[in-house]
Amino acid sequence: MLNNFLGKNVRIIDDDNMEWRGYVRSIETPEDSDDGQWWLDIVNVNKPGFETGLSISEHEIKEISEII
């Protein structure tokens, strides 16, 4: 499911109820990750301190939607 967001602008609510917005630059599949989870690499993140991007795992994501 998360692979549908590759190359899209997204809005994410994480497990701490924080909102993140950015562009999904790459995805790591469960087969490729060390912990067997999906991972999203987000760039152009809307929060100070995350200028180089954000990596977030599937279990940290409560909600995700495409920003059109």
Residue ranges and their predicted role:
Residues 2-68:
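Conserved RNA-binding domains used in RNP assembly and mRNA/RNA metabolism
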